[in-house]
Amino acid sequence: MTLSSEMSEASALAEETDIDVVGEEDDEEDEEEPQPRHRRRRRSYAEDEEEEEEEEEEDAGDLHDDALLPRSPVRAGGGGGGGGGGGGAGGGDGPGGSRPPSRGGPQKAAAAGGGGAGGGGGGGGGAGGGGGGGGGGKNSLVKPPYSYIALITMAILQSPKKRLTLSEICEFISGRFPYYREKFPAWQNSIRHNLSLNDCFVKIPREPGNPGKGNYWTLDPESADMFDNGSFLRRRKRFKRQQLPAPELLLRAVDPAAFLPQPPPQPPQQPPCAYGPYGCGYGLQLQPYHPHSALFAFHHPSPPPRQPPAAPAGAPAAALPPPPPPPPPPRRRAPLLPAAELARTPFGYPHPLGPALAASLHAAKPGSGAAVARSPFSIESIIGGGPGPGLGAGPAPGAGGSCASQSGAATGLSRSLGSGLAPAAALPAAPGLAARISNC
């Protein structure tokens, strides 16, 4: 009993002493440790501030050297870094402070990381400012003071053939002006619209043997003085094209000499008259005919018929025909007749009797020379409109002689009409002639 009681008392005392020792050690640690911990934290915060100040000075020096942005973005970045450091320090004062061995290192690392992140943010702001300064340099390109019409005209005039496609025009403008080179896709449609809507530009279709895409564009020759004194800065007025046939436009556009001043066109010459006095007087555009044509021999006046020499009494009735008359002088027309005489003839022009017709009449009717001399021959007597004044004055000398003489005269008349008159003038006389011959 005594041993057990002693052992129990000893164990209880040992437990009490152990508990007291542990509590004392904790109290001692609580009393001793806070001062170094606060000192360490203050030292770390001061070091972080020094590092941040050094980074701010370096960033500010770089920005002053480059002269791109003011110091306000850098200060904002520095403030962010300081805030990160403060956050790290606050984390160290949190509940984890009761166990310093396990959490002291991570808290310091977090504080240092926060400060570094803040400094990095400030550096990023400086980089962004540098990028903005570079963008301002690109916008310094100035737009040329030329209109799209002037740019297109420049491109076409510098080409050897004075014609270009849309892609070639855009290539010239991009190579000449840097502003349009930077903004190439935006103004291509404007060039296309100006080519289509302005009359000073003419579209030329591509030749069949010339492969490629797109039509050619050239300048209208009449729009050469479109700009004042050759300056492309100002146009005089809007050019309007005159209505010209399409083939002439194409020929003038393809030929480089078409840009020179053209002489005034000459008035068209009227063709000579070919159908008597009604040809030119009534505006009939007829084809000229050869002046020596047999169909128009009646335009030239024939000389008076020669009387055959008196045949002896014993000579036969059929005499040789007289020699042909000399050819009429060329390019001479008969004088115009009055309206009454033109109305008497069926075609509106005189029909003088040829020498062959007069000779045949004399050969067929030797006894009726006085009647023929008294009354001229008329076409109305052949058509059937009525006998002539001389023929109907007295009775015929004899039935047999009259029929023979009329048949001979009809034969000679038909030959003369067939050789000296047009076919249209000889055809209407055929029915009346056949009727008179049948009556005989």
Curated annotation (Swiss-Prot):
GO terms for molecular function: DNA-binding transcription factor activity, RNA polymerase II-specific; RNA polymerase II cis-regulatory region sequence-specific DNA binding. It comes from the Eukaryota. One of its GO terms (cellular component) is nucleus. This is Forkhead box protein D1. Residues 76-97, 112-135, 388-401 have a biased composition (Gly residues). Signal peptide: none annotated. Residues 143-237 bind DNA. Retina. GO terms for biological process: anatomical structure morphogenesis; cell differentiation; regulation of transcription by RNA polymerase II. Residues 1-14, 99-111, 402-417 have a biased composition (Low complexity). Residues 1-135, 295-334, 388-417 are annotated as: Disordered. It comes from Gallus gallus (Chicken).
